Amino acid sequence: TSKLKKHNPDLQLYDNTSITPEELKERALEVEASALKIKGIHQAEGANASHAHSEIFFQTSNGFSYEWMSSRHSISVSAIAELNGSMERDYDYHSARWLEDLRSTQEVGQLAGSRAIARIGSRQIKSGAMPVIFDKRISNALLSALLGAISGPSVARGVSFLKDKLGLQIFDDKIQIFDDPQIMRGYGSRLYDGE
């Protein structure tokens, strides 16, 4: 155990930047104002700015222990577009471990507004088999569904849609999923886990 602890890379999971409630309020107002500057955006449904600092203590039954600090900064806004009696809403959100990596309030607000405007005039299409391009915002939901489906308990209980796919390829060759817990400043990054 002590050998492992001697070779820990610094994954930069903790930013000790301190943010006051007033600064968070100002960020929320800025991201909202940026969304409202987009032509066709009539209101913002909500804007948020937050930061958190955490201290994690990790202990296993075999005596291994480790502790580390982590941080998170985030901003988000939801914008409502209106044109010719049609209303649409969309949002943007960004979070980062380090404040310096957080996208600007202007960028987040403008993207939320632009996304809402782009939805105006959208319509439902007929059902059918067709190529689909997913917005990167849903990648986490897709991956979460997959992880739930490949979990041992789900497969053993027979409730997984992949229960009969053991040993079979389930994705196209072009789709690659990497599990790398040591990405610098990554949300899922950590030096140790419970296994």
Regions found by a protein language model. Name each.
Residues 1-194:
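Active-site bordering "gate/hinge" segments
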